């Protein structure tokens, strides 16, 4: 039951006396006077209601009451004869006043008032159970893949049955258990007996297939430390973990950046830097379709609200052939369907933004949900900007995003999902004359937005064949300008389609193939400084480059993959992906191979090798401002790892990796002086290597956390320059975080980060440019220095109150609680003779309140 006091509803009450309630002591009736023949009998037991979070002095509290039961059977007076104190005495009295009795009666049958004594026992409630682990599986015959219907499936632990289920006509079943480890057993007639140890996490939902051989004789038992076949191996971040994760403000896409392989982006820029790759080398997908913008301005919030996120697949390298046009890593966001049962919602108000979400079922297999979020950081940002800053806001940074989702499930084998989602960021500022370049004045205006209409259809065409199809129509706009001379305007229309077929030929062999196509139509208008070197110089000293054009780009691709499992514990995934890039008129063929070996009950080995290519950036291959005959950029990626279970709830994963880069696009400085020279070339190379370590600890329902450490080096060679550290080379990246459930609705979490500073190029001197009246910096060796080490401590505290029909949460998520000044860059004076550290965000507390029902 739920209600105002969960503890009170769970408390047990009992009559103190073994006999029925007795009348209070009195003189024996005189001769001829009527005597009590039947004492009062309790008709309805009303539980005592205690305030939430009541502390019990002992496991059981006893209150002895004196009750006067009237002739009507109602309690007319109640008092405490022997109590424990408040709030127990008051709760017992309040409950007793609502008791109903069969009244006491004389021998004549007349109802009369009677005083009785009751002893009420109130027991301390047991702690709330963790969310269940849900396993949805199928029992199939090995070889023929025929479903095994009508089979009883049992989940048990230490001899106790936790759940039962029966397979349907397709061999499907589902069990929910509140333990992280259990044995799944089934004994289909004429087949192997299944007995497999299953391990999961609270709140996790998993789908698995189990293959059992047909037998000519009596049943035999197959005992395995893991299920006979696992379809997917992945890290799981449950919604409960993300909601209270310190430093992430409940944002799942922020939380995933605490994993190894993800570098820290400077200035909260929201850049995605995975395994030493450039920010533009990695891609983010939503159900297989790319999201143009991952984070809002400032990098604190992602552009897709976490309300409808089901899971996030974070792959910093060696991803499958499903994905292409990227030589870094990928993040694929999986969306949950709106709840088809009842009406639910959530409202979240904090110092940074406000969000609201609603969802519910419509009947006929339809469910609908929507969410909207809008920042109001602009309302108090002006108060924290120094008065001597060369910047004043006309429109302070603001954003909004929205998501509307409709799902139709006509039967278990089909699902249609329609989504309309988008995001908008806007800022307008007045920039006064900076010392470094007084010509850069006027209004700075930036608007970035995107809107996607997406349809996903999933169909099980048969027990062996499945099809996934996705179609998206999108619009992206970028409108930026600085004063009257510089601007960049882009309106990008996108049509993308993806479909794949998965065919399970046998337990040993599975095939997967698909197509992935994108078409872009872009209106581009720009006038910008033509910077051709790696280091910034005053824009007024550079020539300007401008163009206005309409460009059509199309990127069709096809991919195929086999899953070969010669043994249940060993599987290989060879695959190939073929892409066509219309802007450079080039083919790209990417062979890839992944391997997974379950060495023992607690050890898994994984390895991968593959080729990954991506087209140049549009401005690099454009006819007017770029070089159209470039080659695709390319990387060879190799990684190998081990996943070891050290103890129940404790796992260690170590993954060394290496990436060799070639055909990297670099600017050609000679093009500024010789127009016949190409603006860009494919002469860039690079290498990236390192080790990722992830130690995860989940100790029961109280504590969860991890230690993520990445050692990594990333180098680039841009001829004629020698090899140099990459701009985002961070040799050491340590993140330690954990959350502890204190009880009674309280939880506390902390995150500590220690990260190497990014490389930096020093300014040695400057030269005065009389034509523009500014000083031009003279740089030293590129990336020969390094900025200061970054470290920060974040703390989050949550308090949850649970009511009858809804929950209220108060939280404080504070980033950089020590207010440590972390260096993000150097700030130079007008002639570059002096410099001071440019530091990042100070302490950032986000206080919020959230209600959900």
Which sequence ranges carry the predicted segments?
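Surface-exposed extracellular loop regions of Gram-negative outer-membrane beta-barrel proteins
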Residues: 426, 523-538, 584, 597, ...
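Gram-negative outer-membrane beta-barrel transporters
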Residues: 571, 658-660, 681-764
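Outer membrane beta-barrel strand-and-loop segments of large Gram-negative receptors
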Residues: 494-500, 546-551, 631, 649-708, ...
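Charge-biased low-complexity segments
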Residues: 25-162, 168-174, 181, 195-196, ...
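Transmembrane beta-barrel wall of Gram-negative outer-membrane proteins
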Residues: 350-374, 391-427, 445-467, 505-510
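Periplasmic N-terminal accessory/gating domains of Gram-negative outer-membrane beta-barrel systems
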Residues: 168, 190-192, 198-209, 220-320, ...
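C-terminal beta-signal and adjacent terminal beta-strands/loops
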Residues: 753-774, 788-792, 798-853
């Amino acid at each position: 039951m739920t209600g105002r006091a969960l503890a009170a509803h769970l408390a047990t009450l009992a009559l103190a006396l073994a006999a029925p309630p007795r009348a209070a002591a009195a003189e024996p009736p005189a001769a001829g006077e009527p005597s009590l023949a039947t004492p009062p009998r309790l008709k309805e037991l009303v539980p005592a209601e205690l305030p939430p979070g009541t502390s019990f002095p002992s496991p059981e509290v006893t209150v002895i009451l004196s009750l006067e039961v009237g002739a009507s059977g109602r309690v007319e007076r109640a008092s405490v004869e022997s109590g424990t104190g408040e709030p127990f005495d008051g709760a017992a009295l309040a409950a007793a006043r609502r008791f109903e009795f069969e009244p006491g009666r004389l021998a004549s049958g007349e109802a009369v008032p009677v005083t009785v004594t009751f002893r009420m026992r109130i027991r301390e409630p047991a702690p709330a159970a963790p969310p269940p682990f849900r396993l949805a599986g199928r029992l199939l015959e090995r070889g023929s893949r025929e479903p095994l219907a009508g089979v009883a499936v049992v989940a048990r632990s230490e001899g106790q049955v936790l759940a039962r289920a029966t397979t349907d006509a397709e061999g499907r079943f589902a069990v929910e258990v509140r333990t992280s480890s259990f044995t799944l057993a089934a004994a289909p007639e004429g087949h192997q007996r299944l007995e497999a140890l299953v391990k999961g996490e609270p709140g996790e939902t998993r789908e698995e297939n189990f293959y059992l051989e047909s037998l000519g004789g009596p049943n035999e038992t197959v005992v395995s430390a893991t299920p006979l076949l696992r379809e997917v191996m992945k890290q799981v971040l449950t919604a409960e973990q993300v909601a209270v994760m310190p430093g992430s403000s409940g944002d799942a896409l922020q939380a995933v950046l605490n994993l190894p392989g993800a570098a820290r982006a400077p200035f909260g820029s929201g850049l995605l830097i995975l395994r030493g790759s450039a920010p533009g080398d990695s891609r983010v997908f939503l159900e297989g379709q790319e999201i143009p913008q991952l984070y809002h301005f400032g990098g604190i919030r992602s552009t897709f609200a976490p309300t409808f996120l089901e899971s996030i697949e974070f792959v910093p390298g060696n991803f499958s052939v499903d994905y292409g046009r990227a030589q870094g890593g990928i993040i694929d966001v999986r969306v949950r369907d709106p709840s088809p049962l009842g009406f639910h919602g959530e409202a979240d108000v904090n110092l940074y933004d406000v969000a609201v979400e609603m969802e519910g079922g419509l009947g006929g297999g339809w469910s609908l949900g929507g969410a909207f979020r809008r920042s109001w950081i602009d309302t108090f940002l002006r108060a924290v900007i120094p008065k001597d800053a060369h910047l004043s806001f006309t429109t302070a940074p603001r954003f909004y995003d929205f998501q509307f989702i409709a799902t139709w499930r006509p039967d278990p084998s089909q699902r249609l999902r329609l989504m309309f989602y988008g995001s908008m960021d806007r800022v307008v500022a007045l920039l006064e004359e900076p010392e470094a370049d007084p010509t850069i004045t006027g209004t700075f205006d930036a608007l970035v937005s995107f809107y996607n209409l997406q349809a996903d259809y999933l169909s099980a065409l048969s027990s062996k064949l499945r099809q996934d199809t996705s179609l998206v129509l999108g619009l992206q706009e970028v409108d930026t300008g600085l004063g009257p001379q510089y601007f960049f305007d882009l309106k990008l229309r996108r049509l993308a389609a993806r479909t794949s077929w998965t065919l399970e030929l046998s337990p040993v062999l599975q095939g997967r193939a698909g197509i992935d196509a994108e078409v872009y139509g872009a209106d581009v208008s720009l006038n910008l400084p033509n910077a051709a070197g790696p280091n910034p110089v005053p824009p007024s000293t550079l020539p300007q480059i401008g163009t206005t054009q309409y460009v059509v780009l199309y990127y069709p691709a096809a991919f195929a993959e086999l899953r070969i499992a010669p043994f249940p514990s060993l599987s290989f995934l060879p695959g190939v992906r073929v892409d066509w890039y219309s802007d450079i008129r080039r083919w790209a063929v990417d062979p890839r191979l992944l391997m997974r070996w379950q060495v023992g009950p607690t050890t898994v080995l994984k390895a991968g090798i593959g080729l990954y290519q991506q087209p140049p950036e549009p401005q690099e291959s454009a006819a007017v401002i770029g070089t159209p005959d470039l080659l695709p950029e390319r990387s060879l990626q190799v990684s190998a790892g081990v996943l070891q279970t050290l103890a129940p709830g404790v796992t260690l994963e170590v993954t060394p990796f290496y990436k060799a880069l070639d055909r990297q696009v670099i600017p050609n400085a000679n093009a500024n002086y010789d127009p016949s020279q190409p603006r860009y070339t494919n002469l860039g190379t690079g290498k990236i290597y390192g080790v990722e370590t992830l130690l995860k600890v989940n100790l029961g329902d109280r504590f969860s956390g991890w230690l993520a450490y990445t050692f990594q080096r990333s180098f680039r060679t841009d001829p004629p320059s020698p090899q140099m550290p990459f701009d985002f080379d961070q040799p050491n990246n340590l993140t330690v975080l954990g959350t502890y459930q204190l009880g009674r609705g309280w939880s506390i979490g902390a995150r500590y980060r220690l990260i190497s500073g990014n490389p930096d190029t020093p300014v040695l001197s400057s030269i005065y440019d009389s034509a523009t009246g500014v000083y031009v910096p003279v740089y030293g060796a590129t990336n020969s220095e390094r900025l200061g080490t970054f470290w920060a401590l974040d703390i989050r505290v949550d308090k949850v109150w649970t009511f009858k029909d809804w929950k209220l949460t108060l939280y404080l998520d504070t980033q950089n609680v020590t207010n440590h000044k972390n260096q993000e860059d150097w700030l130079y004076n007008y002639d570059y003779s002096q410099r001071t550290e440019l530091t990042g965000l100070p302490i950032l507390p986000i206080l919020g309140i959230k209600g959900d029902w």
